Amino acid sequence: MATQIKLKAKRSTKLPKGFKLSGVKANIKYKNRLDLALIYSQEPCQSAGVWTKNSVQAACIAHNKAKIQNHIHAVMINSGCANACTGKQGEENCDKSAEALAKVLRIDSKHILLASTGVIGAQLPMPRILKAIPKLVAQKNSNKDSIKLASKAIMTTDTFPKTFGITCKLQSPNDLDSKNTSGKEKVARNEKTSDSKNIVINTESKENAKDSTSVENKLDSKTQEKETCDKKAKVEKKNNKFRIFGMAKGSGMIHPNMATMLGFILTDIAISKELLQEALSEINTQTFNQISVDGDTSTNDMVVVLANGAAKNEIISSKSTDYEIFKKALKKVCVNLAKQIAKDGEGATHLLEVSIKNAQSLQQAQTLSKAIIGSNLVKTAIFGKDANWGRIICAMGYSNASFDASKFNLIFASKKGKIAIVKNGVGTAFNENKAKSILSADVVRILIDLQDGTHSAKAWGCDLSYDYIKINADYRS
């Protein structure tokens, strides 16, 4: 039977070791607004990324795909201008931005990634950005204010900054082995001590005090060795802790075929580049790819993970217990950020969570849940607090994920209670007023049991309100 791996994590407001952030006002689109951010690590980082699947991609995406194979020291993010559909000049502006930042940081520009978000089609205001870079670098810090400034600087129509961090503990097989070894050594030590006493008794009976003294010296020596080992173990135990922190932006144009948004995950864990990329790719499909606000996939989407190894753990280079723990930590951070983005959907009044369980496969569960939260008819029903479950079934039906429509159960739930709506594929009589009350909560859950397997998945979205139209109609003004 496989051992259940549990994540030991505590909420943390501190950045991972070795990272610094900053955010300044460069007046890129608006005056007196934070719009340029920096992520920096003095130690070189292993990096991994996932990128938009939109065939029209911003200049920064091409830049990053070319640089991500290198060790990364810095990421510079601007808001207010997407630098998409900007041609050769847009590409040159990326190069100029990276070179200018590299000069101030005194590193090679190949170690720098870039990200942009904002209006498509406009060129970056390079004089303003170049002027702001020295200040951006000078203000980099690891304190709470730097987190606040950087997370605000990457926002566009977001109503709040989105960050989340945790401190975790690794539990590698080596640690378990050391515990077992320690126990065995203790037994052996007791046996040796017992033998030593017998030796002392025998030698005393022979009036051989020198042998007794020799045995006592050996025991003292072993005690000193034990104390030294214990001290080393304590040091190693401290090195098992690592931090992981995430910062994201996203409110509109959210329907990922990757992660429709900007996401930056920082960690001080030591891990190989190959496993870092594999972990991000896997977790991304379960988190950022499972959110939707409006069905639009951006030209600038990206999620990047940087790992600088400052935690000084033994490098994770195989799919060990430590790797599984890291994946759980990464997922915890990504789920939190994904839910924050869905909650902050433009004009949203409800966070919508769809949970599919007992599916035939993970793919089936993910596809069905994503289809439901992506349905505009479902979104508007939630906005109107209308328990129109037929729209949910309709979305499931056109999702291209086959399922047995005669088996599933459907429940609406929130902090105000829960109510069964469908049983074995057939609608049940329910109290409309109770359903309306449940759907009036700020977080609404649609729970679907397919009763056809063992797999599960979740997706997150929001309702579609009148304000969504107003916000996007006025976006360029």
Predicted regions, residues:
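A structural signal for small-residue-enriched, beta-sheet-centric alpha/beta enzyme cores
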Residues: 2-78, 82-92, 103-127, 131-175, ...
